[in-house]
């Protein structure tokens, strides 16, 4: 059978173990992920992403890093494990690739219209990201905020060398 995958881009070797990413995220750091094959399409799915906990302080930091207006109509996208999704969102369709909108039930973040372009991860769809989320869940955090790893007006980063060339890497871990 033919299997769909959005991971068609350049492959990158692991920069840090999932445990290291999880520790940094739990410490309220924003991490840059360059992991596995790059995503194809108009969104970042965790392999070329900036990830953080959904706190007001982190959202403010992301707005500065991404050079966004604080009242941007484009909210950041949440990622959670399949096992946690029903707790936080009204799910009507599978959301492995951020192609559907889910209404927010409750949670540590809000959007202007109570909707989110959600990505739901299961153990088989993205083992790396599922592992990071699993470690976060054990620390009481079950949602990550995700945005593409690029600077304003630029394409998504493909390689570590690309990342080093853009201006958003100051103070970020990868």
Per-region residue spans from a language model:
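Flexible beta->alpha loop and helix N-cap segments adjacent to enzyme active/binding sites
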Residues: 1-174
């Amino acid at each position: 059978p033919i299997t769909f995958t959005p991971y068609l881009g350049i492959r990158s070797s692991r920069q840090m173990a999932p445990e290291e990413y999880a520790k940094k995220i739990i410490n309220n750091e924003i991490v840059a992920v360059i992991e596995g094959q790059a995503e194809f399409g108009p969104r970042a799915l965790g392999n070329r992403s900036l990830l953080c906990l959904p706190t007001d302080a982190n959202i403010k930091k992301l707005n500065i890093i991404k050079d966004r207006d604080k009242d941007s109509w484009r909210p950041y996208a949440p990622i959670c494990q399949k096992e946690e999704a029903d707790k936080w969102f009204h799910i009507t369709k599978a959301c492995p690739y951020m192609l559907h909108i889910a209404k927010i039930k409750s949670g540590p973040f809000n959007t202007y219209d109570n909707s989110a372009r959600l990505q739901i991860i299961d153990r088989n769809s993205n083992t790396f990201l599922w592992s990071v989320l699993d470690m976060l869940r054990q620390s009481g955090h079950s949602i990550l905020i995700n945005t593409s790893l690029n600077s304003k007006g630029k394409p998504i980063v493909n390689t570590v060398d690309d990342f080093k060339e853009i201006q958003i890497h100051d103070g970020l871990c990868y």
